[in-house]
């Protein structure tokens, strides 16, 4: 992306469309929290709160009035009462127009009640004159809460106390009781010694709350000190509802004694745990020196509640009791039970009244989030004396910590007022409740719950009157902490329910991606109609975006009950100042502060108020009229492409700028600079027309417009012959508009409406060649042929060619299309068209679309061709060939059916000529092989004297290599007889598999009777010379890729053998596969594969007698042996020479004598 593009994108992000973000008026005060809340007061003023500003000791919060006319802010004087401690004035603000009122609240007033600090609120209602003292609501802070307490005095009446001290003890008790005179405290008293006497119960005190009338008549009992038993009796009897004890009151026991217990059968370990379980808080007062001993002191610690140091008082004598009465009173007052039973420990002590504020027709409505354990609610002040508390506890008991009243809004429908309160912490998901008045009582009418834990659904509310008729149409509910991975916060758009219908939110609004902590929806306001569409627009703040720099989103009204789903613009705080923080934390709109009649927006940021002015919105209207209305045929029709530059006509272009918004601006002052571009046929690569002025198909001009119309006339030229004379020439106008600053209104600049039409088009059509009536009536006809093919063999050649011929014997045909419907086993591959005799080029035939329907058995496909679009001329004929691929697995039945339909945009009625149906017989290619197996007996021999027969077998293998299963018949031919002599005796047909087959046999005579001559010529014994058995076996299904073997077996005798010059004969059997040739076909050259034969060579031989040969051979061998022996003897072979050799050697070897 270029630097320029990045800059344009950045400007688009921050530009507020018709909110002037370039010249905002900024107010800044050095007051802590300034800008946290803002409201438009009316006139030219905005009230800005600074709730954290410390004006004096224990006084926080201030109000400022910022005026557009003076560009300055000044504090609003307010005399705050001294009890308004740290009230955070201005934390909530509200205004009303009729009458003009300002309601400012400080909901953090700190009120100290004894040892506790409570948080309440004070609000001030100003009239039109902010200098006059406002009314205060409530008129005074509530009194400190009084704790219900049931107090029992257990006094020691033993004999160790003299009468004077006993009277002092009675005076002490009376004085302490009188100090609780205006509290919610009841008293009871028991005296103990050896016996126990209840002098008055809680019921007695309730009937007569005079302490002295109960205490004065008491007489001392005297006796021993049974303190433990007295404590048990108090716990079990006096703290009982029969004696007036209250279930939720604090139970307090005050024990006054002068010594250790004595004579008591009970130990403290027997009674103190019971008192603890009953929740009795025990104070013990030890009187006298007896408790100076460690053991006695430990007894006091045992009696008292823990820690003992907080609950034990020790004085030296009864005279000193008056020194501890204030201490005892303060400790009892400090007892604040947290929560007992089902009763909340807090009612309105922590109310924070005024946390939200609205002005109703009855009076101020102040949200009270802390009431009743932060269940919340609201106070409605109809007069100074009449206050109504509104909450939902009667309907929904599970409202603890819900913060009802965190936000508030007022609804007006048919002059009936309703109230809406938000409870963002209800069950951690949030709740918004609508209240309606029923005979003076505000009751919940309907409600909406949030969806995400922690989203703070209901933290902000805004009622919207979409059409400014005085009736509320919808409520905006903010959930600023709604979390998604890439953005934070959302706003629900909730139209008001009709009748008893359920209240539902129909849409959700979000900020931009990339800001998970953006808090979108933290502030909501009505803008009014800022874009002039007569629907109310709204602004939504997201102060946490861009690391807390903040942003404001503008959403336009979409209808009377909805807003646009996406924002029209986003204004970021960083655009105004890099250091600006929390821009959009508060918003106020809907009023004209700049006296120009346009609604303005006040935006609060940390330490700043920014006033964004609305800008007037303009729209541009354009008209373009051609003269003549159509391009004449004489201009564009030609047979050859020749440059002509003919005058096509003129176009009159008129522009008018109108103001879309209602304002106080003078129409004569509004001007804008308009740059507009004209383009002829802007999307075509080859232009069909151009402007005579520019010699191009484009033209640009810039003019300054007021709120008036300007026109100009332009001449159009056609440079060439037009191929496409059906589509009109398109003239497109697009423009930019920049408003000129209005000097008299602070350089306010008009802007073009965001949804304005940015380009305009006009069409310059061509005159049609349709006769005088201007209605083209074509006369189309269509035929098809299979291009000489008489039968389609499926599984053979993979393509199928067809010829389509189309004629138009009428006028020009527009948008002519041919659609061919064909079975799903065909697939369109290509086409080729014949030549157009006019242009000497091929006709333009182009496939437009293909579709298929897979419903039912007859699934069809279709292909549509555009024929010479856009015009198929009159008296023309085109032929184009179409090639389909044929699926080898397809099944068409016994014929292929193709249907063609021709149609056009002329909308002529269909005739029989516009349809054609082509039928073509179909056969299915098969591929089967039968072969002679090697296991067949190929050779047999015999002697003339041999009379026994030999076994012979011929074996064949059958294989279906094709893609289809089919029924077949297997036929075998076996020679069984020649010259009335049996050759193959009892032939058998044996299948290798258990096939379902039916075989039948018949005997066939040879065609040749002169079998000897035949065998002499050819030594082959087959069915041409011998009688044969024809065995036919019918198989119902020969499955794809199936293989089976068949063996022909029998006995072969040799009586039939006929000698020939060849010395042998060939015995031949044969087989053949038969099938239905009307449905199936063999591919060319495969006819021999379905036939086979097996030959066995049969040869005779002679058997010779071996005895003469053996005898002759033996005698001859003996004679030959005798002759050889005689010859050797004659030669001396058998004479011994050893003796002669010994004789010759004797004289030489004799030893000497």
UniProtKB/Swiss-Prot annotation:
Disruption phenotype: Mice are born at the expected Mendelian rate. The numbers of blood leukocytes are normal and neutrophils rolling on blood vessels is not affected. Impaired LTB4-induced neutrophil adhesion to venules. Numbers of mast cells in the peritoneal cavity, peritoneal wall and in the dorsal skin are reduced. In an experimental model of thioglycolate-induced peritonitis, abnormal accumulation of recruited neutrophils due to impaired apoptosis.
Glycosylation sites: 58, 86, 391, 696, 734, 772, 801, 881, 907, 941, 980, 994, 1022, 1045, 1051, 1076
PROSITE patterns: FG_GAP, INTEGRIN_ALPHA, VWFA
Residue intervals annotated with topology Extracellular: 17-1105
Molecular function in Gene Ontology: cargo receptor activity; complement component C3b binding; heparan sulfate proteoglycan binding; heparin binding; metal ion binding; opsonin binding
Positions of FG-GAP repeats: 18-75, 76-135, 339-390, 391-442, 443-503, 506-564, 569-629
Keyword Cell membrane: yes
Superkingdom of this protein's organism: Eukaryota
Binding residue positions for Ca(2+) 2: 529, 531, 533, 537
Keyword Electron transport: no
Intrachain S-S bonds: 66-73, 105-123, 654-711, 770-776, 999-1023, 1028-1033
InterPro entries: FG-GAP, Int_alpha_beta-p, Integrin_alpha, Integrin_alpha_C_CS, Integrin_alpha_Ig-like_1, Integrin_alpha_Ig-like_2, Integrin_alpha_N, Integrin_dom_sf
Occurrences of domain VWFA (ranges): 164-338
Gene Ontology biological process terms from the UniProt entry: activated T cell proliferation; amyloid-beta clearance; cell adhesion; cell-cell adhesion; cellular extravasation; complement receptor mediated signaling pathway; complement-mediated synapse pruning; forebrain development
Motif (GFFKR motif): 1132-1136
Binding site for Ca(2+) 3: 592, 596, 600
Transmembrane portions of the chain: 1106-1129
Expression sites (tissue/organ): Predominantly expressed in monocytes and granulocytes. Expressed in a subset of peritoneal mast cells. Expressed in microglia (at protein level).
Induction comment: Induced by lipopolysaccharide (LPS) in mast cells.
Domain-related comment: The integrin I-domain (insert) is a VWFA domain. Integrins with I-domains do not undergo protease cleavage.
Protein name: Integrin alpha-M
Native source species: Mus musculus
